[in-house]
């Protein structure tokens, strides 16, 4: 009996120490993350206040059922998106993986937080509402996107089933993401280059408004400068500008190229790479170029939507593809600026609505 009591006391002491150790860990993470975050935010915002709510780790764990698969939305690189409810309000919750964020990626995590906070006043960026500093890396809390994130073919996936969106909505998404990129390029003294435009970074809210997310690969040019040499080539294969890939030189046209590929995917519903009739992989850019050069854009395959499109709508899809091909010209001098792309897409969208 005495030995059992001794054992129980020992277990209680151990449990108490573990709880204390866990609490100390959370406090250390809070102080470290808070210090870095505050420093970066002050530098970025010139001391201006940006209201961001602070959440506790218990709130985050309860909202996501301790990061359960039932709350899973999407996984991308070194983070996972969850949906969760806190105080009767739905949120998108972004958790960085402490196992996948290597030393050189730590700065990208904080860059994502700071730039997301700065972009929160623009309707086409996913709005950052708060964060929790009680994890190895801050857990971010964003506005809820009811219709989720675009899949690799520019559609949405519901209960495992892919669904392509109506042409009018796909045009709207293209225009809104073009607006978001133009904002990055023009709204600040230092041009911001996004560097990783692709469907998996685009969320849709309850009004089907497109929201660009993940600014971790973004890079700012020096004030008055039009280019910068990056330390590393960051982005997604298939969407990368070949000039940037070869030289590491980043300009606003780096985004224009990636957006061109993005637009082709979203408008046609064809993935960036697909299997050709000969069984070999085909890139969407080469495929579209071939059709355009041979005057066969009318032969574009529209998976699952061909029968639903009018001849007028097909002509508008062709116009979008031709615009996208201009974005992907080899020489940057031959590519339009993002603001020009956004204006052209608005013109095409309005023409479709009248058709």
UniProtKB/Swiss-Prot annotation:
Q: Which positions are tagged coiled coil?
A: none
Amino-acid positions noted as binding ATP in the UniProt annotation, renumbered to this chain? 73-81, 94
Q: Which Enzyme Commission number(s) are listed?
A: 2.7.11.1
Example GO biological process term? defense response to bacterium
The record's active-site residues are 196 (proton acceptor)
Keyword check for Kinase, yes or no: yes
> How does gene deletion manifest?
Reduced resistance to Pseudomonas syringae expressing HopZ1a.
Reactions catalysed:
L-seryl-[protein] + ATP = O-phospho-L-seryl-[protein] + ADP + H(+); L-threonyl-[protein] + ATP = O-phospho-L-threonyl-[protein] + ADP + H(+)
Under the heading PANTHER family, the entry gives: NON-FUNCTIONAL PSEUDOKINASE ZRK2-RELATED, WALL-ASSOCIATED RECEPTOR KINASE-LIKE 21
Q: How does it assemble?
A: Interacts with RPP13L4/ZAR1.
What protein does this entry describe?
Serine/threonine-protein kinase ZRK3
This protein's encoding gene: ZRK3
């Amino acid at each position: 009996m005495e030995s059992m009591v001794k054992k129980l006391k020992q277990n209680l002491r151990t449990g108490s120490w573990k709880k204390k150790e866990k609490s100390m860990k959370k406090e250390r993470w809070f102080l470290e993350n808070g210090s870095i975050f505050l420093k970066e935010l002050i530098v970025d915002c010139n001391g201006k206040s940006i209201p961001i709510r602070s959440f506790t780790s218990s709130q985050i764990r309860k909202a996501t059922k301790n990061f359960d698969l039932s709350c899973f939305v999407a996984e991308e690189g070194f983070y996972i998106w969850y949906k969760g409810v806190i105080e009767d309000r739905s949120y998108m919750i972004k958790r960085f993986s402490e196992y996948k964020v290597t030393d050189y990626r730590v700065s990208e995590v904080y860059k994502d937080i700071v730039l997301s906070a700065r972009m929160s006043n623009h309707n086409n960026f996913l709005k950052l509402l708060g964060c929790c500093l009680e994890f190895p890396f801050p857990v971010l809390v964003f506005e809820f996107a009811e219709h989720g994130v675009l899949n690799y073919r520019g559609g949405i996936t519901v209960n495992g089933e892919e669904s392509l969106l109506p042409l009018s909505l796909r045009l709207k998404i293209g225009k809104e993401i073009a607006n978001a990129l133009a904002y990055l390029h023009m709204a600040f003294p230092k041009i911001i280059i996004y560097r990783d435009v692709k469907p998996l970074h685009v969320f849709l809210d309850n009004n089907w408004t497109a929201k660009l997310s993940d600014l971790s690969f973004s890079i700012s040019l020096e004030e008055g400068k039009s280019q910068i040499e990056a330390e590393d080539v960051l982005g997604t294969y298939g969407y990368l500008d070949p000039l940037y890939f070869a030289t590491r030189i980043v300009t606003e046209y780096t985004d224009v190229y990636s957006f061109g590929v993005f637009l082709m995917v979203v408008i046609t519903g064809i993935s960036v790479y697909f299997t050709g009739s000969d069984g070999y992989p085909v890139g969407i850019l080469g495929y579209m170029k071939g059709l355009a050069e041979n005057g066969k854009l009318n032969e574009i395959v529209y998976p699952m939507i061909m029968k639903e499109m009018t001849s007028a709508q097909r002509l508008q899809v062709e116009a979008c593809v031709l615009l996208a091909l201009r974005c992907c010209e080899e020489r940057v001098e031959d590519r339009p600026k993002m603001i020009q792309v956004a204006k052209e897409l608005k013109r095409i969208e309005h023409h479709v609505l009248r058709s």
